Amino acid sequence: PLAENRGRGLAFCMSFGVATAEVVDITVTDNGIRIDDVYIAAEVGKVVDPINFDNLVKGGVIYGLGHAMNCEITYSDGIAKQDNYWSHEGMRLNQTPRIHVVGLENGNKVRGIGEPPVPPAAPALANAIFNATGQRLREMPFNKFVDFA
């Protein structure tokens, strides 16, 4: 069981043939929600370069969480106002959680790992927020509804 003001959320997806499970642990603070830890496991067949694998997974987690937290795409006359990365807030360095990565090797087939960590980040974070606060978030970015520390 988690302590008061704590939440844990889980999400799973298949992305590009890679099964990915992500767990997000948060704490509700006076300054907003702090993402403490992310645990992620990805079944990629064969991990060819463990250091690169670890870094790609962590980058995907940060990218996915940043979009869930802060990035909104708005339109004017059918054209997106945000035209590149500098148009998005993203996740700040001080908001970046500890990320624990496990690569599951269940075969000889090599699969890509750059994108698969991104899709489960938002639902895992939303589930953690729900677990901690009882507030169900169904629209991104989440900073429209909650503050992040």
Name every feature range the model reports, one short phrase each.
Residues 1-18, 23, 27-149:
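C-terminal catalytic domains of large/alpha subunits in multi-subunit enzymes
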